[in-house]
Amino acid sequence: VLKKILIANRGEIAVRVIRACQEMGIATVAVYSDLDRDALHVRLADEAYALGGTTAAESYLNTELILDVIERSGADGVHPGYGFFSENTDFARAITERGVTFIGPPPGAIEIMGDKVSSRIAAQAAGVNGVPGTTEFLNDASEVIAFGKAHGWPVAIKAAYGGGGRGMRVVRSEDEAAEAFDSARSEALKGFGRDECYVERYLTWPRHIEMQIIGDTHGNCVWIAERDCSAQRRHQKLVEESPAPNFPPEIRQAMGEAAVTVARACGYFNAGTVEFLFQDGEFYFLEMNTRLQVEHPVTEMVSGIDLVAEQIRVASGLPLSFTQESIELSGHAIEIRINAEDPAQGKFLPSPGHITTLVPPAGFGTRWDGGYESGDTVSQYYDNLVGKLICWGSDRETAIRRTLRALREFRIEGISTTIPADLAILEHQDFVDGIHSTKWVEDTLDLSNVGSTATVADGESEAKVQRDVDVEVNGKRFSVKVFVPESQAGAVVAGGAAGGASRPRRSGGSGGAGAGGGSG
């Protein structure tokens, strides 16, 4: 089994991986930007190294900086989490070429499935059909018009290397094609660095159902359970649950087998998710996410399988600890994404800021996967996911009631969150009846009366400023930088840390010289 794992990520997923490593007796290495120097994942890790910078491009998406930390820390494995480099073929290859284990699928599988056009071709070649669409990149809007005339309107232009609804435009008539084509390409280029797009038929009332798979290097590949992620807004998932409501057992079996077929066709191992659209008793291949999903905890709750631990086992060369036949599912689980957004009147405006109070709910069947604690700050420069509330019940009705209770119990102050909108979703009869689709939140759910959770903080946390300080350690002089409250900037700061990494302090604070990144 791997001895030391670097987590090339931040927020709740970095915390999730660190905790799994701790339970397995594996040392952990965190990396952080200037804004994240006091972040929870930094405080929890055994070692932490500064990447510098403010934006993701300057830090978490800087390949050379991360490769340098891998070498300096002696990590023998890298977990990419989700987002950032998790589905980047070049990053995975750069890791493996250095003799370090990438905790994910092989680069070749990422390459095939990372491009939505090539993934459609691969799935179709394996006998798993997707929504009718093009298998080549679009050159201009005339091809969109031709496809719409052949298959009917509306159609959807999608970024080939995108996700989360970015780089996607729905075209309802020939007149909208040119503007939508240019807009989709522009957004794709800004969001993913590639502007290639394709077009496909746009289903009118589909459900988004995905299948969790995992394989090892010994030829084993299984499907665990499906997740229904139909409660979405602007193609961003809000609520996920497992098992999917009103989902026929024979369709579940067929979808699971199809997911494994797709995975085997591209030589896949480790954890992955095959996404489908389901409408009128038929399911269509959508894409494969070659990474751990945000919503993986609902599968863990109903299966009892620790997917992160299993990822590490597989990456270490061990076989899966279970077989397809040994998987037993129990009860129902629901995950709520708690984002720093103000849902007032259904607008979902970003709400970065200082969290003055964060007290997650507790109780039987209640789990909180968070990336922040009281006193932490949600930055405008990164994804605003504060954490995920996951509740389990013996059946769906119990799970819904438990989730509602937990949401009402949740205390978070200083920022606005999506909790009021989450309550509106779970209390709506359409959701209770399980008849919602991916269009339901935007087309049916009325959030105009939803209020804000913003609170007036008793006092904002004082800004910290950088100061260069000379310190002496064991008779050797070092120049280090420290971050201190502005009011104390003129004071003499004693203490420091030598070397590139320091043991983070669990209690927060700036950690003296800063965890990692010292010039010694």
Residue ranges and their predicted role:
Residues 508-520:
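Structured functional modules or segments
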Residues 1-274, 278-295:
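N-terminal beta-alpha lobe that positions the nucleotide/phosphoryl donor
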